[in-house]
């Protein structure tokens, strides 16, 4: 071993004379190769963010030249870089290309949002060293980690802020951050800061989230009365929020008093252009602005303001303290990106793009870091192409940065991070007054996690206005609570206040009394309803076609169902009325679709005799009850409890005062933790969406026109009421009452519902409730409660356009668009921002609709909210729809229901037959997914517990060469191949007493002896099945590779096993135990076109008799050690036939085993 290492060291020292190194298990070829993934195409004028990639090729060439000059790193000389343009190739596809490139040792670069890219690389065991990714490594679970992130961590800001708070003993602060432009990374940074402040018992007196471009004067004045120490986090460009807030404090003379201090943070990513400007640039003096003309401040005022301001940033260190870094920056500027081919071949790089020095610094550090780790690994003969081995050399390392500072990679593959500190002062070296980087906060070593300050050439020296740090609390407190009034003036003050109060009471007695009654009413929680006052009812939505079939089957005729439909679209009954309706027949129909009038859900079942608490807990989104003799609707709010603050009580008061024929009536609230419900009047005919989705419900122009008129009338009322807007307009929130009038619901309560914890939707349904939401609200990161009323009103106009599109097109809110809801929502949110045409529904759906409707829809969903028409303009535009119509909506509805009832009488019988047929299909499908005995237990409502089987046999097979076939074939060809092969297999296994467990890619798993035991016949059935499958693949043809043969490899093992149903959605019958693992090892260590058999299975086959078994020998298996293995070569079909006939009476499952007449033998 020692001689091998010495020989390896000799090779490495003389690598320039060799083109490869022979290691123990692999050959390393030189030069080494890496992939670099970045959106290079965005630097050529494309309207997308190049993420600093423009100068990467230039910097890479300089970095490689530096490595070539280092004789200690000869293994990394002449590094071969393959540039992958992610702007032309989707990020995941580019990552997959890099992952499958076996000739590279790592993938560099990646994207900011690199979760999918990193996951693909990790799954494929490819090292990733990213200098731009902003992913949280804690989110990576389920496979070995192979990623290293060189970008700053999200907790760097929190650690730097705590450094200053601890140093000056500040315990009370104000936190200010933008309400817009927050990326996922910025959100995590802010969250980590809040966690750190809370953990260190720092009182957050103010937490303001402001629009950087709005007038914040009043808010700054309000905040200044509540706090003295301000932490301002700004991710906007040109430090708009920090500058605006700070200069407003200056205009109020707060900063000049010396009693205030601002600790500001600006993102280098959005401010690097002016942060890297020369010292004479006015933007460095004015925090990103060229002048201060918009503020009532002078330059001398600014000098006083800046004394109590420290700026933090996540950028790179300055160039001046380090000559090497300064020289590299000069070389990068001289080497123009346009001359770098690849990747800029036959393209022109935009001249306006400036270098991103943070990205370039991280590139140099990444290359040097990867070179050092590779050299260390090869020095001891480690395999650098095996990620789990190589990754150990990449973590817990020190990095000597090109900027002259020391960085650290922790044990999780993430850089420890650092923060640059800026301060305004007059620099002697630059002979100017400006914002200069003066120090750096970071860890001093990998093990010492305490952050310390390191000064640059001109270090941090805070020149406080009052020569000392301000206190976090005024001497007398923020409200004078620490200081009493002067002793001599107490009597005068009391008399004066008393007289003033009496005069005020005399003048405003009537007003105060009215106000008192209003406030008393607010504090009395007048809207609260005792849960015991509501009698819960079962209900189902009869507009559901499945529910109609159930109703008809229960009542035995169409007349009963249609009569109920005339009066209401809900069937309601008492919980204890079990004789009239079988709950399982209506509510447990197997459908998971939701369609209630206040959101999804057709009703809830519940068990007769359940306690009152259980009944309330089982209510999903929507329920029905009886309150004070009237039927009411219960809308669940997804909060475990509610603190009725004054603002929430005011919301509820406005809601109760909203009385209009086109809005739903608010009745009250039921709050008994963990259940919170809003109680409304019940809209008897469900929602507009229920009607539109029912293909059997005929609609005419009168219906559509009247519905349109009602919706606009309801919106007009809300916009002019104290509530001000709707915010959640969609067809499911347009309810239909007994008189066929539209009543809008789910408006108001923006603050109460702003903290709802919504249930997670599945991937297909994710985003479906946002299909009506305007793009500006989709981009609004702080939720509906933080939006201005005017913005939400314009958003209501957009939502109205989608509802009209749905009403007149009757193909849903997005017509026949095939994409999933979440994909539609993503395109609506992002397409316009990327400079593309805004994504909207296909107007071809409305080609048969009136032109005025088409024109209104197009105008109302305009991207710019200010260009959308007002409700008054829309109402005037659509007025011709109702002119000349003499019949009322009720007359039309009565006629419509009569037609609908006649149609039902003809169709119900046919649908009953269809229902029976669908039931049979469902049972057949269930038995295809689960064993028949398990499926029968589930149909009876019984629980299926895990069961232990003393002896069974497990079968695994796969197709060697499948991975290579997948790499060289089209995906559709692979799917056709697997479908053809498994169709043959599935037909064959029907002839044996076996159960197919699952297929994964080319792997096929079968078991025998469970869930119905069959004695020792399980081993024989599996062996016979394997022989039949081997015979079948001899004649099997691969469609796209007709000259290739399937080389099936089979493994089998017998032993004890535990089996049971796992999961609630898409349940699977799964097997557990060492028997399964050993069977898998038999297959993976087997020989193609052979049945590889374990010793335990061989013993059972010997007992059964009739099988030809050949000893293979001892095989080393991972996790199992050395195992004796055998081949099953053939069988005597006569012995099997006699054995099965003899044992069928004893083991019923053998009855499905068909007896083969021919013996299969293989050489």
From Swiss-Prot:
Binding-site residues for ATP, renumbered to this chain: 593-601, 635
Main location class: membrane
EC number: 4.6.1.2
Record-level Gene Ontology MF annotations: ATP binding; GTP binding; guanylate cyclase activity; peptide receptor activity; protein kinase activity
Tissues with expression: Expressed in ASG sensory neurons.
Annotated ranges, domain Guanylate cyclase: 953-1083
Membrane topology category: Single-pass type I membrane protein
Domain Protein kinase: 587-882
Gene Ontology biological-process entries: cGMP biosynthetic process; intracellular signal transduction; receptor guanylyl cyclase signaling pathway
Cell compartment(s), UniProt: Cell membrane
InterPro entries, A to Z: A/G_cyclase, A/G_cyclase_CS, ANF_lig-bd_rcpt, Cyclic_nucleotide_synthase, Kinase-like_dom_sf, Nucleotide_cyclase, Peripla_BP_I, Prot_kinase_dom
Signal peptide stretch: 1-17
Top-level lineage group: Eukaryota
SMART domains: CYCc
This protein's record includes keyword S-adenosyl-L-methionine: no
Description of its domains: The protein kinase domain is predicted to be catalytically inactive.
Name of this protein: Receptor-type guanylate cyclase gcy-21
Organism: Caenorhabditis elegans
Gene: gcy-21
């Amino acid at each position: 071993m020692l001689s091998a290492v010495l020989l390896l060291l000799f090779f490495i020292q003389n690598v320039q004379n060799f083109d490869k190194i022979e290691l123990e298990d692999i050959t390393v070829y030189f030069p080494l190769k890496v992939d670099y993934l970045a959106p290079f195409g965005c630097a050529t004028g494309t309207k997308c963010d190049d993420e600093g990639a423009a100068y990467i090729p230039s910097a890479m060439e300089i970095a490689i030249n530096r490595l070539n000059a280092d004789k200690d790193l000869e293994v990394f000389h002449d590094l071969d870089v393959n540039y992958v343009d992610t702007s032309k190739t989707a990020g995941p596809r580019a990552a997959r290309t890099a992952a499958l490139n076996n000739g590279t040792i790592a993938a560099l670069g990646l994207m900011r949002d690199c979760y999918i890219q990193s996951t693909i690389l990790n799954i494929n065991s490819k090292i990733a060293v990213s200098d731009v990714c902003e992913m949280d490594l804690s989110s990576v679970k389920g496979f070995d980690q192979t990623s290293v992130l060189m970008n700053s961590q999200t907790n760097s800001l929190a650690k730097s802020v705590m450094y200053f708070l601890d140093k000056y003993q500040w315990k009370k602060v104000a936190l200010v951050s933008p309400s817009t432009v927050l990326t996922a990374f910025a959100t995590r940074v802010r969250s980590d800061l809040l966690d750190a402040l809370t953990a260190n018992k720092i009182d957050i007196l103010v937490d303001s989230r402001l629009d950087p471009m709005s007038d914040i004067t009043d808010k700054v004045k309000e905040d200044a009365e509540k706090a003295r120490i301000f932490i301002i986090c700004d991710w906007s460009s040109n430090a708009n929020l920090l500058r605006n807030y700070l200069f407003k404090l200056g205009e109020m003379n707060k900063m000049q008093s010396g009693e205030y201090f601002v600790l500001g943070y600006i993102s280098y990513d959005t401010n690097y252009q002016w942060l890297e400007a020369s010292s004479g640039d006015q933007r460095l003096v004015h925090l990103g602005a060229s002048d201060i003309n918009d503020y009532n401040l002078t330059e001398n005022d600014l000098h006083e303001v800046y004394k109590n301001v420290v700026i933090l940033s996540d950028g790179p260190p300055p160039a001046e303290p380090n000559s090497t870094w300064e020289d590299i920056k000069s070389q990068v500027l001289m080497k123009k990106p346009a001359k770098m081919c690849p990747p800029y071949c036959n393209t022109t790089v935009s001249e306006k793009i400036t270098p991103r020095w943070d990205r370039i610094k991280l590139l140099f550090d990444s290359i040097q870091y990867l070179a050092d780790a590779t050299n260390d690994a090869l020095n001891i003969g480690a395999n650098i192409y095996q990620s789990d081995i190589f990754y150990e050399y990449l973590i817990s390392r020190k990095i000597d940065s090109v900027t002259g500072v020391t960085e650290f990679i922790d044990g999780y593959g993430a850089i420890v991070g650092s923060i640059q500190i800026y301060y305004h002062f007059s620099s002697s070296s630059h002979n100017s007054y400006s914002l200069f980087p003066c120090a750096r906060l970071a860890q001093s070593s990998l093990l010492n996690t305490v952050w310390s300050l390191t000064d640059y050439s001109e270090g941090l020296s805070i020149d406080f206005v009052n020569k000392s740090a301000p206190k976090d609390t005024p001497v007398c407190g923020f409200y004078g609570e620490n200081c009493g009034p002067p002793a001599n003036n107490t009597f005068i003050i009391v008399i004066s206040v008393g007289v003033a109060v009496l005069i005020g009471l005399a003048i405003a007695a009537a007003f105060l009394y009215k106000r008192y009654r209003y406030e008393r009413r607010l504090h009395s929680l007048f809207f609260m309803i005792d849960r015991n006052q509501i009698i819960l009812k079962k209900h189902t939505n009869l507009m559901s076609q499945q529910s109609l079939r159930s109703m008809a089957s229960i009542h035995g005729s169409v007349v009963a169902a249609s009569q109920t439909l005339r009066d209401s679209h809900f069937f309601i009954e008492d919980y204890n009325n079990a004789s009239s309706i079988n709950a399982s027949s209506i509510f447990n129909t197997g459908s998971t679709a939701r369609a209630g009038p206040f959101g999804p859900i057709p009703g809830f079942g519940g068990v007769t005799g359940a306690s009152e608490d259980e009944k309330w807990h089982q209510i999903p989104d929507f329920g029905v009850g009886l309150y004070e003799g009237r039927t009411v609707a219960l809308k669940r709010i997804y909060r475990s409890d509610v603190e009725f603050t004054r603002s929430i009580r005011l919301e509820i008061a406005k809601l109760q005062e909203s009385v209009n024929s086109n809005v739903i009536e608010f009745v009250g609230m039921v709050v008994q933790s963990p259940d919170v419900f809003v109680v409304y009047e019940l809209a008897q005919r469900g929602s507009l969406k229920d009607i539109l989705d029912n293909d059997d419900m005929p609609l005419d122009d009168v219906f559509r026109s009247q519905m349109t008129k009602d919706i606009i009338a309801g919106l007009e009322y809300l916009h002019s009421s104290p509530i001000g807007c709707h915010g959640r307009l969609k067809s499911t929130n347009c309810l239909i009452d007994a008189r066929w009038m539209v009543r809008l619901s789910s408006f108001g309560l923006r603050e109460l519902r702003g903290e709802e914890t919504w249930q997670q939707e599945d991937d297909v349904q994710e985003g479906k409730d946002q299909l009506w939401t305007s793009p500006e609200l989709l981009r609004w990161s702080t939720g509906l409660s933080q939006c201005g009323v005017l913005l939400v009103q314009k958003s209501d106009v957009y939502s109205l356009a989608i509802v009209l599109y749905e009403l007149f097109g009757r193909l849903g809110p997005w017509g026949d668009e095939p994409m999933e809801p979440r994909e539609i929502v993503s395109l609506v949110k992002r397409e316009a921002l990327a400079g593309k045409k805004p994504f909207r529904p296909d107007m071809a759906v409305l080609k048969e609709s009136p032109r005025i409707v088409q024109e209104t829809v197009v105008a109302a969903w305009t991207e710019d909210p200010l260009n959308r028409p007002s409700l008054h303009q829309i109402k005037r535009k659509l007025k011709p729809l109702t002119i000349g119509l003499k019949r009322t909506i009720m007359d039309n509805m009565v006629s419509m229901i009569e037609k609908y009832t006649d149609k039902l009488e003809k169709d119900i019988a046919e649908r009953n037959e269809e229902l029976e047929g669908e039931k049979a299909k469902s049972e057949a499908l269930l038995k295809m997914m689960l064993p028949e005995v398990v499926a029968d237990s589930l149909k009876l409502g019984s629980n299926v517990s895990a069961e232990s089987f003393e002896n069974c046999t497990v079968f695994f097979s796969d197709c060697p060469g499948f991975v290579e076939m997948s790499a060289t074939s089209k995906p559709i060809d692979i799917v056709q191949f697997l479908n053809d092969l498994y169709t043959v297999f599935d037909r064959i296994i029907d002839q044996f007493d076996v159960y197919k467990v699952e297929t994964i890619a080319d792997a096929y798993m079968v078991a025998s002896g469970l869930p119905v035991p069959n004695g020792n016949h399980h081993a024989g059935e599996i062996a016979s099945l394997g022989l039949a499958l081997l015979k079948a693949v001899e004649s099997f043809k691969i469609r796209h590779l007709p000259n290739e043969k399937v080389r099936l490899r089979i493994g089998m093992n017998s032993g004890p096993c535990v089996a049971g149903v796992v999961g609630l959605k898409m349940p699977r019958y799964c097997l557990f135990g060492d028997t399964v693992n050993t069977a898998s090892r038999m297959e993976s260590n087997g020989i193609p076109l052979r049945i590889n058999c374990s010793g335990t299975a061989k013993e059972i086959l010997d007992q059964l008799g009739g099988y030809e078994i050949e000893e293979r020998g001892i095989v080393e298996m991972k996790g199992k050690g050395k195992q004796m293995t055998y081949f099953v070569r053939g069988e005597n079909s006569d012995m099997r036939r006699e054995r099965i006939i003899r044992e069928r009476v004893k083991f019923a499952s053998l009855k499905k085993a068909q007896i083969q007449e021919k013996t299969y033998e293989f050489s």
